[in-house]
Amino acid sequence: LNSYRVMDETAKQKKLENGRVLSEVEAEKKIRGFTDHTDYDLIALSGLITTLKWQKKVLNILQKLAPSSYKISGGGLATEFREDLLNWMPDLDGIAHSEGDDVILKIARDAKIIRNSRKMTKSMLTDVVSPEKTTILNGKLYTIYGGGRPKDLNALPFPDWDILTQDPNNKDILENYINTPIWGKEAKNSSATSFSMKRSINTVSSRGCPFACKFCFRGAQGERNYGIRSPENLFCEMKHYVERYGIDFLGYVDDNFAVSRKRIFELEKLISNWTTENGLIWGTHARLDEAADIKNCVDGVLKLNEPLRVNSMYNAGCRYIGFGAESASPRMLE
């Protein structure tokens, strides 16, 4: 829904160059444009905790427009709260936690079987979704799907952005998405940049994070199971997006991009000249101690690793790093 921006007087008054987001009434009208065309077996929701409010609104709309569709919520929100999410969104049919590459196929299969069955008893539903588990909450049976990690992240195909080229109402939402900045003041997502971007796309170079900071939830992209894609694989994807979509910024929304110094240095050698020649810059997320690159401390004197990985990232075209520092509020720390 965020891809459908409205450019009207309200957007102009608020100086929203890419338009404002839809109101709840406008969102329902837009969703109806989909449900009037197709009777969906499966409707999947996804997002982080910041999307909970909108997911609840969208789910209420879907209950009116597509009451018999199998409705599952996945991604970071479902991974963080698991079954507890069902207390907030009881109209769901289940949740899918962790990574979705494999389990989405199982969910789609189950949805088709369930929709094609005239009457689905609790025992029948349990058999259909097996070996995934089920749980009963307030008298309703829900399915709890658990995703897994593909053995080789490099073997996965690149995201097929072209499927967003045209929706059922012949609306090109891909261009709206690419023309809306991922990060920066215009993005309205608590990020800030010293530069602007005209055409941007996001992707991930790694999943999870090997660290276990108590203040950080890393479940959106792999939890503590850290895995990376190779520099060569990243370069191929980067070139593909520049050549096909003409992007000038690529955002790696990793939980922690900078874990591997070796990968960063290899990436620098591979892409530094190419990014400069093709006018592409990129950004990502990392830890503050990785940016500092402290090797050790002897007699109160800090010794840094050489070369600094952030310098290597800069040489490779990185111009934005988002850090998730622990709260400076004593009350929050307590």
Task: Please describe what each predicted stretch is.
Residues 154-334:
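Radical SAM [4Fe-4S] cluster-binding motif and immediate context
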Residues 2-153, 157:
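Glycine-rich beta-alpha loop elements in corrinoid/cobalamin-binding modules
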